[in-house]
């Protein structure tokens, strides 16, 4: 392999047209539409100058811990890695996970990323809803607040405001690290507790309504598998770098709904009926959000009304949004709360790392964006009208109590959320329950719901939302245009002109006429439609279009300490007194690599062009940037396809498909690693 400081990575070497054999240019989906790819989306795979980044990492959005020096080896070292569980990364925050591409630039309401309209938001969005399109806005430090008038005494909550670490990737702007709550992968998202299942409540309805109760240790074991056992803490495996991210997401969901098993949930409740997990212990979700965390979030970040926070009320059957203009600072927010208004935080995962970690884990299992909204409601208040949503909702009660009434759907599995409904439209509730701290409530899309706090308690809850626009209908919307387009090329009858008298026989004005000629035309069109049968390849390409949507919407991955020392995000660069830069890593033919996450990339073919989409570079806002992708030659695609099928196992570079020569293959794999797409099995030793 050539000199490390002189070698240029394969992806970085070709920055012009994608027509040459080795061209692997990174582009944007809408470059033709915009005339040229946006500058901030043309981030090269190796560095902005086409080669490796030389020089020490900057502090403006780059990883800057000078003590992180545990890196670099050829990867061929056969050292036993069983000590990883106790192997600190020479950092005082060894349990901290790092979030990629925070892009901490202050948001402006006038920019497209901050406009009120969103693919998934409506003015009549209501409390159980977490429109997945809610903007995920980046954060900017604004210093300490000298005063924060509060209407209620804040409960104590864990607070460890550390500087956020962002990784050495090209940033949109020079930014300053932001103080946020830092999550430890060794801290449980759920409190340990023993659990059992109660029999379902008797309902005058043949729909299965679940009631699952967790009890103190020593309680009776229920019929549900796993009852009487302690809920597993959401702790990482000792071999975090060897785990399958889909299985991690599945395990996380299983712990949320325990003691109900995943099999029971998917068979009896998923997209079918609601259920509640009732706990007898409090504090199950208290490390995800609290009054104190909200207060610190408002102080430390530029959070705006309408973009990031809504102030709402519901009185006398009328729902109102009472948002002021501008930034939402603590005195203003708490004053609204004291007057009886509900506070909805639209993108808390942009600011709260532990909540973001939960969403990131679940999105791998659901293969779609998992959003989060936070709702804070004062005593004896209701912030939203009855309504139904177009998402699968998981309500996590954090503080206080809230009464929920759930009504049977008027339309099963709707594709869009409802407007505000009146009380006269509801009928009798199927469920009428009070959620307490640690309780969880699930209800499918289409189930009407409303919630109100009781006289003696406020409420703080999180709504996780998933599976928005993930139906067969969405797949068919992508598929049928492909079928029509390709069928036209193969079927002469589809290319023939319409009859000259078709306007006089078809259309709404002619619907009552049942003449023979009209019926003949209708029959002919129906026969043509029956020829439009999708091929296997068309179905694959349509599904890839849905997968591109996920790549665009997904939250960037959070990086555990064990992963940090195996990825580019923990790499260090040093320079001597003469300014000569050296890196602390080097890949070799014997280095074993794998994808960072199961769904981190998606290979697609569009108009004969092979592309690889990835979400490592996504921002924390919803669709802040154009989709990230680079274009490939077939032999590049074969390498990525091999890595996809090998996941979660590691593959040595020398065992990947050949690519011209070994040097080309090594440079290509190294370019993927430098983009944050790959992880090595063994931590690098110092060179």
Curated annotation (Swiss-Prot):
Bias (Polar residues): 100-116, 136-156
Annotated GO MF terms: 2-oxoglutarate-dependent dioxygenase activity; histone H3K36 demethylase activity; histone H3K36me/H3K36me2 demethylase activity; histone H3K4me/H3K4me2/H3K4me3 demethylase activity; iron ion binding
Compositionally biased residues, Low complexity: 33-50, 58-74
GO cellular component: nucleolus; nucleus
Subcellular compartments: Nucleus
UniProt-annotated stretches for the region Disordered: 1-174
GO biological process, one term: negative regulation of DNA-templated transcription
Function summary: Oxygenase that can act as both a histone lysine demethylase and a ribosomal histidine hydroxylase. Specifically demethylates 'Lys-4' (H3K4me) and 'Lys-36' (H3K36me) of histone H3, thereby playing a central role in histone code.
Family membership: Belongs to the ROX family. NO66 subfamily.
Name of the protein in question: Bifunctional lysine-specific demethylase and histidyl-hydroxylase NO66
């Amino acid at each position: 392999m050539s000199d490390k400081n002189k070698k240029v990575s394969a992806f970085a070497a070709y920055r012009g047209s994608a027509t040459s054999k080795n061209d692997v240019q990174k582009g944007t989906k809408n470059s033709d539409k915009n005339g040229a790819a946006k500058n901030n989306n043309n981030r090269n795979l190796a560095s902005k100058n086409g080669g490796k980044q030389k020089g020490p990492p900057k502090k403006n959005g780059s990883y800057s811990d000078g003590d992180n020096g545990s890196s670099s080896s050829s990867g061929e070292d056969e050292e036993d890695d069983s000590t990883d569980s106790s192997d600190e990364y020479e950092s005082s925050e060894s349990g901290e996970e790092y979030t990629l591409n925070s892009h901490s630039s202050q948001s402006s309401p006038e920019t497209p990323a901050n406009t009120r309209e969103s693919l998934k938001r409506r003015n009549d969005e209501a409390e159980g809803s977490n429109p997945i399109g809610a903007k995920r806005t980046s954060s900017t430090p604004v210093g300490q607040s000298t005063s924060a008038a509060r209407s209620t005494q804040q409960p104590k909550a864990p607070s460890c405001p550390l500087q956020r670490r962002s990784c050495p990737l090209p940033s949109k702007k020079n930014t300053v690290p932001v103080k946020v709550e830092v999550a430890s992968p060794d801290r449980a998202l759920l409190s340990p507790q023993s659990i059992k299942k109660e029999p379902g409540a008797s309902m005058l309805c043949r729909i299965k309504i679940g009631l699952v109760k967790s009890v103190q240790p020593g309680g009776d074991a229920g019929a549900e598998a796993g009852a009487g056992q302690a809920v597993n803490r959401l702790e990482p495996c000792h071999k975090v770098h060897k785990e399958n991210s889909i299985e991690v997401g599945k395990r996380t969901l299983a712990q949320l709904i325990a003691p109900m098993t995943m099999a029971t949930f998917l068979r009896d409740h998923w997209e079918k009926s609601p259920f509640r997990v009732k706990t007898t212990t409090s504090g199950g979700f208290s490390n995800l959000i609290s009054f104190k965390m909200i207060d610190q979030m408002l102080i430390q970040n530029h959070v705006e009304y309408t973009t990031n926070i809504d102030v709402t009320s519901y009185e006398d059957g009328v729902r109102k949004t009472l948002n002021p203009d501008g930034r939402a600072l603590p005195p203003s927010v708490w004053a609204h709360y004291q007057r009886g208004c509900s506070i909805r935080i639209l993108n808390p995962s942009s600011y709260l790392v532990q909540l973001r970690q939960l969403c990131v884990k679940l999105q791998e299992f659901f293969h779609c964006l998992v959003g989060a909204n936070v709702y804070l409601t004062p005593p004896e208040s209701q912030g939203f009208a009855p309504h139904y949503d177009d998402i699968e909702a998981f309500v996590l009660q954090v503080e206080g109590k809230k009464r929920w009434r759930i009504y049977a759907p008027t339309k099963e599995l709707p594709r869009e959320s409802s407007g505000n409904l009146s009380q006269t439209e509801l009928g009798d509730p199927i469920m009428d329950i009070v959620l307490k701290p640690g309780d969880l409530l699930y209800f499918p899309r289409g189930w009407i719901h409303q919630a109100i706090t009781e006289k003696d308690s406020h409420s703080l809850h999180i709504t996780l939302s998933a599976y928005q626009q993930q139906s067969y209908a969405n797949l068919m919307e992508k598929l049928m245009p492909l079928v029509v387009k390709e069928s036209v090329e193969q079927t002469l009858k589809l290319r023939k002109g319409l009859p000259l008298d078709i306007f006089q026989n078809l259309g709404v004005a002619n619907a009552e006429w049942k003449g023979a000629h009209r019926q003949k035309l209708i029959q002919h069109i129906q026969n043509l439609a029956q020829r439009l049968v999708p091929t296997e390849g068309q179905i694959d390409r349509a599904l890839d279009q849905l997968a591109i949507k996920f790549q665009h919407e997904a939250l960037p991955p959070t990086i555990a300490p064990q992963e940090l020392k195996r990825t580019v995000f923990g790499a260090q660069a040093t320079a001597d007194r003469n300014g000569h830069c050296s890196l602390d890593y080097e890949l070799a033919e014997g280095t074993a690599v794998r994808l960072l996450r199961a769904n981190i990339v998606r290979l697609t073919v569009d108009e004969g062009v092979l592309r690889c989409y990835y979400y490592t570079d996504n921002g924390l806002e919803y669709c802040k940037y154009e989709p990230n992708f680079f274009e490939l030659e077939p032999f590049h695609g074969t390498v990525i396809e091999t890595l996809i099928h090998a996941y979660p196992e590691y593959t040595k570079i020398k065992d990947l498909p050949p690519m011209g020569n070994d040097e080309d293959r090594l440079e290509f794999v190294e370019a993927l690693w430098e983009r944050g797409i790959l992880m090595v099995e063994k931590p690098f030793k110092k060179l």
